Structures are given as structure tokens and as C-alpha cells.
Curated annotation (Swiss-Prot):
Recorded family membership: Belongs to the cyclotide family. Bracelet subfamily.
Pfam family, one: Cyclotide
Organism: Clitoria ternatea
Protein name (database record): Cyclotide cter-R
Record's signal peptide: none
Amino acid sequence: GIPCGESCVFIPCTVTALLGCSCKDKVCYKN
């Protein structure tokens, strides 16, 4: 539920995905 500061509208989460973030509502979130 914490915004990771990366969007995933056109491309999936990249850098933040390595930190455990996933795409939700066009934004990368963690928990």
C-alpha cells in the first residue's frame, strides 16, 4: 500500500519491482 514513486501505465514496474513493489491502479505500490 505504500507508493514507490514509479508509474506502470505503459510499462511495468522496473526498478521498484526489485524492491518488492507491484503495479496497482497504474502506480507501483509496496504493501
